[in-house]
């Protein structure tokens, strides 16, 4: 089970400060998790400009130009935001026994280490 999943609210904890044009301290939702590369794409963070070559679509409209979109950021540079305190926290795992239809099942649950609340 991963510490950070798609849809989690995270905060950038390293990098340039916002006063110098960086992203440190910004919060955003995780759009995508790149498991093989240990990277995440966060909404509204780490924008890059990409120059796209002019081409044509099936309808004949021109495409291309300068586009901006979010680039990936390493998972060690972000921290999950605690839903209770709205501050960055570490993620812990605990096993809980759930009984459903008379069958006991062991489930791993993520929780915020600062508040102890389930995620």
UniProtKB/Swiss-Prot annotation:
Name of one Pfam family that matches: ribosomal_L24
GO molecular function terms noted in the UniProt entry: rRNA binding; structural constituent of ribosome
InterPro entries linked: Rib_uL2_dom2, Ribosomal_uL24, Ribosomal_uL24_KOW, Translation_prot_SH3-like_sf
Entry keyword annotation includes Metal-binding: no
Keywords: Ribonucleoprotein, Ribosomal protein, RNA-binding, rRNA-binding
Family annotation (SUPFAM superfamilies): Translation proteins SH3-like domain (SSF50104)
GO biological process: translation
GO cellular component: ribonucleoprotein complex; ribosome
Domain of life: Bacteria
NCBIfam families on file: rplX_bact
Protein's job: One of two assembly initiator proteins, it binds directly to the 5'-end of the 23S rRNA, where it nucleates assembly of the 50S subunit.
PANTHER family xrefs: MITOCHONDRIAL RIBOSOMAL PROTEIN L24 (PTHR12903)
Subunit-structure text: Part of the 50S ribosomal subunit.
Family from the record: Belongs to the universal ribosomal protein uL24 family.
Protein name: Large ribosomal subunit protein uL24
Organism (species): Leifsonia xyli subsp. xyli (strain CTCB07)
Gene this protein is translated from: rplX
């Amino acid at each position: 089970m991963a510490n950070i999943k798609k849809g989690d609210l995270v905060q950038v904890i390293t990098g340039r400060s916002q006063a110098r044009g960086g992203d440190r301290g910004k919060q955003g939702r995780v759009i995508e998790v790149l498991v093989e590369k240990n990277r995440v794409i966060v909404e509204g963070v780490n924008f890059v400009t990409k120059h796209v070559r002019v081409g044509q679509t099936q309808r004949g409209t021109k495409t291309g130009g300068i586009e901006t979109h979010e680039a990936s950021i390493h998972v060690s540079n972000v921290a999950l935001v605690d839903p209770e305190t709205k501050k960055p926290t570490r993620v812990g795992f605990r096993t809980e026994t759930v009984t459903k239809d008379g069958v006991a099942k062991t489930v791993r649950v993520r929780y915020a280490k600062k508040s102890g609340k389930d995620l």
